[in-house]
A protein has these predicted regions:
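Phosphate/NTP-binding elements of NTP-utilizing enzymes
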Residues: 1-223
Length: 223
């Protein structure tokens, strides 16, 4: 059995390379503070303040709270992948949209590039639509003459005044080589016909990013 470390409320396997880990309450609180600015972006709760469910809080603590010490003594996010399989109607689209906006606006990247992927472009567009609603119905889209972020429906993109972009991409593999995303939101991974798109998006794509995030929130499939 691998050695386990208890870091605050999170249990992790001890790193094989001897990396020094810690649990950062502040890193978790930064994510929670951002979500406190958001509203729900779809269904009958649209416009209501965003209330995180227990599973969402657990995922945030586990992914964002664990940090490793870098060679220069600074701390960065230890985990690159957040993966959760969920039953239907469990808030997956909403939290995916919220996390996409977090990585677009709040994660410390100077020019973030957030990609939203799914089994088809229309499915990924549900995440975009929720994120767009959140931007346009909260302080993120204010003031109207100089907003922090705004949507470009013709391209299914959300831009920021600081040069960041969140965008819906097709599931075509051939034109995805060479992308460097600061964050990847992958919806309904179980519905992919094979692992080609996954491999193209994740193999080496973090080389130019200090703490790339790959977030997979999927409905449990048959395979």
């Amino acid at each position: 059995m691998p050695e386990m470390l208890q870091l605050g409320p999170v249990t992790v396997c001890a790193p094989d390379d001897g990396a020094v880990l810690r649990y950062s309450e502040q890193a978790v609180q930064d994510v929670l503070d951002f979500f406190s600015l958001l509203c729900f972006g779809s269904n009958e709760w649209a416009g209501e303040p965003f209330q995180l469910l227990d599973w969402e809080l657990d995922a945030i603590r586990s992914f964002y709270g664990v940090q490793e010490q870098d060679e220069d003594g600074s701390w960065s996010r230890y985990r690159r992948f957040l993966y959760d399989e969920l039953p239907k109607k469990n808030g997956k689209t909403e939290v995916a949209a919220g996390l996409g906006l977090y990585h677009l606006l709040w994660d410390g990247e100077k020019r973030p590039k957030v990609g939203i992927f799914s089994s088809d472009k229309d499915n990924a567009a549900q995440v975009y639509d929720a994120a767009k609603y959140m931007v346009e119905h909260t302080c993120l889209g204010q003031p109207e003459h100089d907003p922090i972020a705004w949507a470009v429906d013709s391209k299914r993109e959300i831009h920021t005044k600081y040069g960041g972009v969140l965008k819906v991409y097709s599931a075509d593999v051939a034109n995805k080589h060479g992308y460097s995303f600061s964050a990847i939101i992958f919806d309904e991974l179980h519905a992919q016909p094979n692992r080609k798109l996954w491999d193209v998006l994740t193999a080496g794509s973090d080389a130019a990013r200090r703490q790339q995030a790959v977030i997979v929130l999927t409905t449990a499939g048959d395979d």
